[in-house]
A protein has these predicted regions:
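Polymerase palm active-site segment centered on the conserved acidic dipeptide of motif C
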Residues: 179, 230-259, 269, 567-581, ...
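Catalytic palm subdomain of template-directed nucleic-acid polymerases
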Residues: 100-108, 211-236, 409, 489-494, ...
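Core structural elements
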Residues: 170-187, 191-219, 232-233, 271-285, ...
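Short glycine-rich phosphate-binding loop at a beta-alpha junction
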Residues: 57-65, 269, 400, 501-504, ...
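Mixed-charge, glycine-rich, non-catalytic linkers/tails in nucleic-acid processing enzymes
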Residues: 81-94, 116, 139-257, 413-427, ...
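Active-site-proximal helix-loop-helix substrate-binding element of RNase H-like nuclease domains
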Residues: 20-23, 31-189, 430-468
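Catalytic phosphate/metal-binding cores of nucleic-acid and nucleotide-processing enzymes, i.e., regions
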Residues: 6, 10, 19, 185-189, ...
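Acidic, glycine-rich two-metal-ion catalytic cores of nucleic acid-processing enzymes
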Residues: 2-31, 43, 252-476, 582-673, ...
């Protein structure tokens, strides 16, 4: 198969210009000296672009997804060919290749560890890779304001024959260097024993995600102002009385007259000394060591505050203030933009959501861009989601995978061991969260234990599930409590979390489970029985680790009760899913990474691990918990969700698919949730069902033996509270608050 290297030059990035107008396209064939270049004033440019995206050859580029989107915008009739070529696996991106090479050798995608113990940030720009592989410094050409890169828009409408020599040299150098890096990556892969499997798959996913970025989401000015007001009210000193009384929050200082002028006022600020003093007191109450920073100061980071906030009302307020403050610090500024029209910063009518297609977990991430108003679409505060609304005449079609990571875990165990309780529960038409919740309730709730005496856990599941639709609020509350507890238990323990980390995880979103509160409500009989059981040895280990005290000094403090409950929950989880012990043993024995070595603070070697994803990507340099999470949960789910994103985007944009979704526009990808903007018409139900079918079809690529469901819903604005709503004919209709 021939290989073509291609690149484009465009107008500059900016608001409304995520994939700007195409100016010129340049290309070369592998091993040939000739480099072609055509401007948008050349009548042959369309035919050349058509040849570049035609089937039958490998197409390679640096951030090739940008080039393909630019070409599709310039020549819409080429869009079907682009999608077909991507699905055929004939397009690859140097960035995806480089990341997979790093993932399969060191496992590090962000920072490389140097021999002296320091770290170096890993770059994926053409300039970064040219310097790494070729010793070629391209930084001036890429970064200088006067570089030809920034002025191709001035050549709009011209034939390439009329381009200045600097612009010709710049464009041709880019495509030549692309070839040189590509060949160097191949050599490095062979020399290092690496792998770039799934480069084409991730390139296809990257194109779909970039199409979503280009669309962006419209903002609602009224909702934005409501959010700003909510933040200001929440941060008002009147709402922070405990913080003020503790001296942690200094009040604002108003400007005052001084020497004929006015002093500069000061906003409310945090008194670090008072904060640290409260943290120390709370740590003593919680009976945990005070964590210190490298500089010897008391640590008051989010993890520490999470662990001790329950012991100090002022720290609870501080935690709430930090959460709201994050909206003020990140969400609100990212929604604003200076359009350089003399009106200053203001709410942008459209916010874009850029994506990083491949991170170390093999999942995706999202981040803001400096080039246009943008935000991290995968970590939007729920209180800010309502600012994003569908365009006039459109609605949001949301859909997420139901219990995605439990499905992938079931498939992984079934593939490895030929059996999986998760799979059995799903095939029986039951819900794993409710299934585990029933087992937890049988262990910890005496009345439920009595009412299910002699039952199988299947029957106990059915009884608990029936309470969801009970006419009695107490039954509904009971169902919600135990299914809610099962979520962090069933999703946290497969990742190998210890009890302390699990307790902190359970307390956070999306679970919000107060394990400490539940532990303190349990009767003394539970703890008497626990002390006589097999888990007491583990609890004594944590007692000594956290307090430094001997076994003889053990006392049932709230902290020890909480850890005991966490250990008990994990024990019940193991009893319901016994293959998980085999899963952990498999990781310890079959997933050892013999190529990479890590050391702890004392210089002792730490065993690292590796694994292969369902589609064949290799990930090395992992901790045990990274493999436990990645092998069974994160990587399979990520690959299936990326495949779904590609299929949905293609049907929305490729007219040859003949899909009811054609003309719709996906705008958001949030790991297991995909939000698409669709016209508000009589086919909304059909579009929703088709989207759900595509998501199920995509996940079958990685989970062929465990079925999954995708649950679509319609809403006018993004909301965490939205639910599927059906009319009398059982057709999906628009949910409203």
């Amino acid at each position: 198969m021939n290989t073509i290297f291609a690149d484009t030059e465009t107008f500059p990035f900016g608001p409304g210009q995520v994939a700007p107008k195409l100016v010129c396209v340049q290309w070369k064939y592998l091993g040939e000296d000739f480099i072609g270049l055509l401007g948008n004033g050349d009548p042959e440019q369309h035919a050349q672009c058509e040849a570049i995206v035609a089937p039958g050859h490998r197409l390679v580029g640096q951030n090739i997804c940008y080039d393909l989107r630019v070409i599709a915008n310039a020549f819409p009739n080429l869009e079907p060919a682009i999608w077909a070529k991507l699905e055929a696996g004939e397009v690859t991106d140097l960035i995806m290749r480089e990341k997979l090479l790093n993932l399969s050798t060191t496992g590090k995608l962000t920072f490389a560890e140097l021999p002296d113990g320091n770290t170096l940030r890993i770059g994926y720009s053409m300039a970064d890779m040219a310097l790494k592989y070729l010793g070629l410094d391209m930084s001036a050409d890429k970064d200088d304001a006067g570089s030809p890169r920034n002025s191709f828009g001035l050549l709009d409408g011209l034939s390439a024959a009329l381009y200045p020599p600097r612009h010709l040299d710049y464009a041709k150098t880019d495509v030549k260097v692309t070839e040189m890096i590509y060949l160097a990556q191949d050599r490095a892969c062979e020399a290092l024993g690496g792998s770039m499997v799934t480069a084409e798959f991730n390139t296809a996913a990257s194109f779909a995600l970039f199409c979503m970025t280009e669309r962006g989401a419209v903002t609602d000015e009224a909702e934005f102002e409501k959010m700003v007001l909510m933040v200001e009210e929440a941060l008002h000193p009147d709402k922070m009385k405990n913080l003020m009384e503790a001296g942690i929050l200094r009040p604002a200082v108003e400007p005052r007259p001084w020497r004929g002028g006015m002093t500069q006022g000061k906003p409310p600020s945090i008194n670090e000394a008072a904060l640290h003093a409260n943290v120390v007191r709370a740590c003593k109450l919680a009976r945990i060591p005070v964590k210190m920073t490298e500089k010897g100061n008391v640590c008051a980071d989010a993890e520490v505050i999470e662990a001790v906030a329950d012991y100090d009302e002022a720290l609870q307020e501080y935690q709430d203030r930090q959460a709201v403050g994050q909206i003020k610090k990140t969400e609100i500024p990212r929604m604003k933009w200076d359009f350089e029209d003399g009106r200053g910063e203001r709410l942008s009518p459209i916010i874009y959501f850029p994506y990083n297609t491949l991170v170390e977990t093999t999942r995706t991430s999202s981040m803001a861009s400096e080039h246009y108003p943008s935000s991290n679409g995968q970590n939007v505060d729920p209180r800010a989601k309502g600012v994003y609304k569908a365009r006039e005449g459109w609605v949001f079609l949301g859909a997420d995978f139901s219990t995605l990571e439990l499905v992938t875990l079931g498939q992984t165990c079934y593939t490895l061991f030929g059996k999986s309780t998760h799979r059995d529960v799903i095939l029986a038409g039951r819900d794993n969260h409710t299934y585990l919740g029933a087992a937890l309730a049988r262990r910890l709730d005496p009345a439920f234990r009595v009412s299910t005496t002699g039952m199988t856990n299947d029957a106990a599941h059915d009884l608990l599930a029936s309470m969801k639709k009970s006419q009695h609020p107490a039954d509904q509350k009971f169902f919600k409590k135990w299914r809610g507890l099962a979520k962090p238990t069933g999703l946290g323990n497969p990742g190998g979390l210890g009890p302390i980390k699990w307790i902190a995880t359970a307390k956070k979103k999306p679970y919000f489970v107060d394990v400490k509160g539940m532990a303190c409500e349990l009767p003394d009989e539970f703890y008497f029985g626990f002390a006589e059981g097999d888990l007491m040895g583990s609890l004594l280990y944590y007692h000594k680790k956290l307090t430094g005290k001997s076994d003889d000094e053990f006392a049932w403090s709230p902290q020890m009760k909480t850890i005991a409950l966490a250990l008990e929950l994990r024990s019940v989880w193991f009893s319901i899913y016994p293959e998980m012990r085999t899963y952990f043993d498999y990781i310890k024995q079959a997933c050892q990474d013999e190529r990479n070595v890590a050391k702890d603070g004392e210089g002792k070697a730490i065993q690292l691990y590796c694994y292969e994803t369902p589609l064949g990507a290799m990930r090395r340099g992992c901790t045990f918990t990274s493999v436990a999470n990645g092998l069974g949960l994160q990587s399979p789910g990520a690959e299936g969700a990326k495949a779904a994103t590609f299929l949905i985007n293609r049907e929305c944009r490729d007219v040859t698919r003949g899909s009811v979704l054609y003309g719709s526009r996906p705008i958001l990808f949030v790991h297991d949730e995909i939000i698409t903007e669709i016209p508000e018409d009589g086919l909304m139900h059909e579009k929703a069902m088709r989207k759900g079918d595509l998501m199920v079809q995509a996940m079958a690529l990685v989970c062929p033996d465990v079925p999954i469901k995708a649950e679509p819903l319609l809403m006018r604005a993004w909301s965490k509270d939205a639910q599927p709503k059906f009319d009398a004919q059982k057709r999906l209709t628009i949910w409203t608050p």
